[in-house]
Design a protein with these regions (language model features):
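Peripheral, non-AAA+ core regions of ATP-driven protein-machinery
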Residues: 1-158
Length: 158
């Protein structure tokens, strides 16, 4: 179950949230504002008060807005195709933006999820694998990308 909270104060892009359960430093949350979800990161926790930095304009944000904490940290997505794109600091694809800025609450995929790559297996079916083990690789241009087991996974490779 995701932790919930409510905005209790706003100073520019620094927002204070009262939470109903513990959250972690650097955890990602989304603040609901008229059907748009503003991404923010926890920068300080003091008891049930959490200070978050909002990465977008807070114009229109009010005390009482609902906040949902995702239970994970700010992450980047790595994979083939990453070298052929331009990103901002949150890994939004700058080439797909309509204008100079993204619209509030709009997020782009950092990778082309429809692109197909030639996969060369490095693990064999039946191998026991754990986080960070190499499963295989794909080549982007001249650079091989290693495909690894995600950090929270372990098991038999099929």
């Amino acid at each position: 179950m995701k932790t919930k909270g409510k905005v209790v104060s706003i100073i520019a892009n620094l927002v204070t949230v009262q939470v109903d359960a513990p959250v972690a430093q650097n955890e990602i949350c989304y603040i609901e504002l008229g059907g748009v979800h503003l991404m923010a990161e926890v920068i300080k926790v003091i008891g049930d008060k959490v200070y978050v930095q909002v990465f977008e304009s807070t114009r229109g944000l009010t005390v009482g807005c609902e906040v949902t904490f995702e239970g994970h940290m700010l992450e980047v997505i790595l994979g083939p195709g990453i070298l052929s794109r331009n990103y901002d600091g949150l890994q939004h694809n700058l080439e797909t933006m309509d204008g100079v800025f993204l619209k509030r609450g709009e997020y782009t995929s950092p990778l082309d999820l429809k692109a197909q790559w030639n996969f060369k297996p490095l693990a064999n079916a039946g191998d026991h694998v754990r986080s960070a083990d190499w499963l295989g690789e794909v080549t982007e241009g001249w650079l091989p990308h290693k495909i690894m087991v995600p950090f929270a996974m372990e098991g038999t490779y099929v």
